[in-house]
Amino acid sequence: QVGLYSALIGGFIYMIFGTVKQVSMGPTSLMALLTYEYTKNLPSQYVVLLTFMCGIFEMLMGLLRLGFLVDLISTPVTSGFTTATAFIIVLSQVKGILGVKFKGDSVIDIIEKLIEHFHERRNGDIYLGLAAIVFILIMRELHNLPVKGKIKRIIWYVSLSRNTTVLLISMFITYLYESSGTPLPYLTSETAKPGLPSLQFPPFGYTSGNTTVTLPQMLYEIRSAMFVIPLVSVLANVSIAKAYANGGTVEATQEMFALAMCNIAGSFIRSMPTCGAFTRSALIQASGVRTTMSNIYASCLILLATLFLTPYFHLIPRCILSSVLISAVIFLVDYQIVKPLWKTNRE
């Protein structure tokens, strides 16, 4: 539910203030892990306030013109950050392929719990998930076939729709299972509450029972997160920009303003902190996006899904969602930089 709300407004705002056409604003695995780490023992009000404060901090960075600091970040650092993020995303999605459920607080915790719950794996999820990955990767390469003219364009559209095709086929399979009354051999997604979120101010204090928590008390609890998460989100957006800039310039200061507007506005619909999503950005790049206007299509689809499609989310197998994410994010790993770095300095 929070994920849908977080993805809803960012696209509309980034379309206006953003500069990187590949960036897809919304919730990410990286932001979710960081937010969970800082607020896991706190009420949900802290998450919304954290979103607002992240926006304020990003706005201050933009007003102070701190975008030049991003230029000091070397290519290997950006590449390492992107690769590490891709690794975290893939690792967090392995449980979906295995068909197991657990919550992981960190990379080490996820690995430990994968080993701990490995005996609970479900063959249905594994077979369907791996088949989906193979299918998606094969369809991804269709556009490289040596054909010309209209056939090439048709094949390009088929290749482009690979994720949607896999999703619809899997939903149809789930529907057939449910219609026949046969138990599902794999786990499916949960339904979400339909309807749009209500507009309300971020919680600058709250009352729980006989206890009143003031704004200074709330800010003290998230004091570290207010600085760490905005910095990571800026680095994420800039990393995406550099990954697709092909040597071009990156307007880091403007990206700070765009992130600030997305998070401040998002806090009014109870969003979590957001930034550019590596996975969705990879999907957008593969789709041949030309401008930031692509965000409006994604946001409109999320809006329609929130209003009308939430009752059907239970038809989507979890392993299919994991397959789509893994198939997209593995191409963010920068293999080419390893060889020159190895030749430059082996110590």
What are these regions (language model features)?
Residues Q1-E347:
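Transmembrane helical cores of multi-pass ion-transport proteins
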